């Protein structure tokens, strides 16, 4: 049954388009741990219930949110903190967008 299936680090990496080394790094930093670590082989295994958390971490990284902030979000799981984190990042991205638009306008002016 799929709900009880264990996924190796390689399978998890491939399914989520993420490097195995990134999963190891997230584990090392306390951001995303495997469900099971075999004590004899030290192989990491993940379960299907971890998929949504990994997708959330990937989304937050795509927004350029620092790992320190992502770890705090995961540790706290506080809706108010999550909302604040996203609002803050949105403002930073809008500021960056305005800077890019300004630079493009200057470039366009110099071209013509």
Where are these regions (language model features)?
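Basic helix-turn-helix/winged-helix DNA-binding cores
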Residues: 1-63
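Short, charged amphipathic alpha-helical surface segments
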Residues: 58, 70-112
